[in-house]
């Protein structure tokens, strides 16, 4: 099906479709999913600011927030962005006092800097600017 669609597009649209597909996959790699408790600890212990997005697949506001986090990760090269599925890693969520989703927690060197409960992109942007100075 994909080949049929690509072949039926006009040449200039074909390149747009390919470029858009490539760009989306490049951006998606910027918010990395946590694979284990050890992986989580390693990532939040970094010298740079780490934004931890606690989410769940069933959470509507979490889905709304995802593209904004991907865009922020592109714009803030000095910060790292990770995602923790609160259903899969309930122990990590509990350890961090996460009782509402989405919750974003900012860390540096393993220490919590700040926390945002809810899909508040403006506050996250301003906190990133504050802690990256």
Swiss-Prot record:
It holds the Pfam family Thioredoxin. Residues 1-29 form a transit peptide. Disulfide bonds join 59-62. Induction: By aluminum chloride and ferrous chloride. GO terms for molecular function: protein-disulfide reductase activity. GO terms for cellular component: mitochondrion. The active site is at 59 (nucleophile), 62 (nucleophile). Its main location: mitochondrion. PROSITE patterns: THIOREDOXIN_1, THIOREDOXIN_2. It comes from the Eukaryota. GO terms for biological process: cell redox homeostasis; cellular detoxification. Disruption phenotype: Leads to auxotrophy for arginine and cysteine. Keywords: Disulfide bond, Electron transport, Mitochondrion, Redox-active center, Stress response, Transit peptide, Transport. It is found in: Mitochondrion. The record marks 53 as: Deprotonates C-terminal active site Cys. The record marks 60-61 as: Contributes to redox potential value. Residues 30-133 form the Thioredoxin domain. Gene3D superfamilies: Glutaredoxin. Interacts with arg3. Disulfide reductase which serves multiple functions in mitochondria, protecting mitochondrial components against thiol-oxidative damage as a thiol-disulfide oxidoreductase, and supporting urea cycle and respiration in mitochondria in a manner independent of active site thiols. Belongs to the thioredoxin family. This is Thioredoxin-2, mitochondrial. It comes from Schizosaccharomyces pombe (strain 972 / ATCC 24843). The lineage of its organism: Eukaryota, Fungi, Dikarya, Ascomycota, Taphrinomycotina.
């Amino acid at each position: 099906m994909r080949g049929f669609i690509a072949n039926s597009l006009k040449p200039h649209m074909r390149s747009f479709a390919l470029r858009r597909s490539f760009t989306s996959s490049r951006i998606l790699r910027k918010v990395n999913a946590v694979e284990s408790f050890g992986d989580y600890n390693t990532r939040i212990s970094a010298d740079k600011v780490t934004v931890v997005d606690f989410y769940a697949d069933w959470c509507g506001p979490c889905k709304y927030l995802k593209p904004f986090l991907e865009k922020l990760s592109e714009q803030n090269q000095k910060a790292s962005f990770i995602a923790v599925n609160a259903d899969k890693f309930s122990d990590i969520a509990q350890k961090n006092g996460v009782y509402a989703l989405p919750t974003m927690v900012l860390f540096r060197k393993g220490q919590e800097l700040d926390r945002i409960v809810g899909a508040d992109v403006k506050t996250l942007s301003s906190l990133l600017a504050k802690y990256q100075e």
